[in-house]
Amino acid sequence: KLKEAGLFINIRTIEGPQGAWITVDGKKVLNLCSNNYLGFANNPRVKSSAQKAIETYGVGPAAVRTIAGTTNLHKELEQKLALFKGVESTITFQSGFCANLAVIPAIVGDGDVVFSDELNHASIIDGCRLSKARIVRYGHCNPKDLQKKIADETLVSHSSTKRSGNTPPLSPPLQGGEGGVENLPPGEKKTNRLLIITDGVFSMEGDIAPLPEIVEIADKYGAITMVDDAHGEGVLGRGGR
């Protein structure tokens, strides 16, 4: 029944290293579906460094980072990533999925609002659900729809609060602004935290998010912008930034 419904997963077995050409189930094929954009998976220098690290640290930390699993290699990597990105600090996770599950609930919670592209990755969707924030989906890569959804949401919330006389739950902003909207009268700005979240490059479609327009909207409404750039980091922009 699963096969008839198109829900049965066909697991491909890869023989050998990742590359432009790979052997799948005994057949050489062109690889168009891996994340090995920079060719690190089978790079001689990377493999040599990995072998040296295994000799020094073994094959794994054998513990979670917060207990006894953080090595000086983790710290060195995070420091170099921060330098690469030009930021104060970074933190690494086991996977992009884990990152979204951890980061989104740390930014928003009950009483806050997330504006999520309708084709965002499953990890973003799950992270938003875990946060317990209200989720508003906007049209794929559509800044006009995003602005309309934010305007509608903030005005509805403002009107409801004014009628009830209640103060909306407060989530202090992480950066700049008041986490409200500029087009409301002074003293009547909405205080819930607003988060706009999008993939940078959508892995299934290949679309690139219109980040300049999204950031402009975020600035206008006092929202935070979060970008999952798993498929753009190191690939797009000058020097991969």
Name what the model sees in each region:
Residues 4-59, 223:
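N-terminal "arm"/small-domain region of PLP-dependent enzymes with the aminotransferase-like
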Residues 48, 52-96:
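Conserved N-terminal alpha-helix of the aminotransferase class I/II PLP-enzyme fold
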Residues 103-122:
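Conserved PLP-anchoring active-site segment centered on the Schiff-base-forming lysine
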Residues 110, 130-132, 221:
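Short, structured coil segments at secondary-structure junctions
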Residues 119, 201, 229-231:
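Conserved Walker B
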Residues 136, 140-165, 183, 187-227:
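Active-site phosphate-binding strand-loop segment of PLP-dependent enzymes
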Residues 236-241:
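Basic, amphipathic juxtamembrane/active-site segments
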